[in-house]
Amino acid sequence: DIEIFMYGLISILKDRGDQVFTIIATDGSKGGSDKTKSLIKTRKIEAINGLKTLSKPIFLDISDGELGDNINHKKIIKQNIFKVSPDIIITHSKNDYHSDHRALSLLIREAASHYVPILYCDTLMGVNFQPNFYVDITNYYQGKKDAILKHKSQNPERFVDLFELMNSYRAAQCNAPKGSY
């Protein structure tokens, strides 16, 4: 879901010369109608292709729907954060619609908030989220769209429609011209 929620900002950071690491916590095993092991492989390939211009993702392979506030997951998250030693972390909001996103937000906050600044991305359709700042990603619109469309197993067009609406709305809040994201 990096492509939907964070791709624009991460692209900006990459273009200014920052080293970018992307970590995907869950395996995607329940994110589609195919519930076989092949779905995990498909989702991994889609993530690699979607993030190709940003970084090679690190996969933690925790089962979809099982990410939670437990000692093992805390350890895995903390180890991976310290392995890449980030200057900032971008993660999901604690108010996100998805239980794995909420769990990841909590785990990251507990693992890293005393060591590195954490930025929380917008929620799907902005529900229960009030931005503290806005980032113009208009120049990265096509890259974000292309990255989302790499996820063929998830009917990606619906997410493109949602991101266009959400990002247009946030741009309008800043009085940006029509066609801004």
How does the language model describe each region?
Residues 1-84, 110-114, 146:
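Active-site rim/loop-helix segments in enzyme catalytic domains that contact anionic ligands
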Residues 12, 34, 56, 68-181:
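Metal-dependent de-N-acetylase/amidase catalytic core
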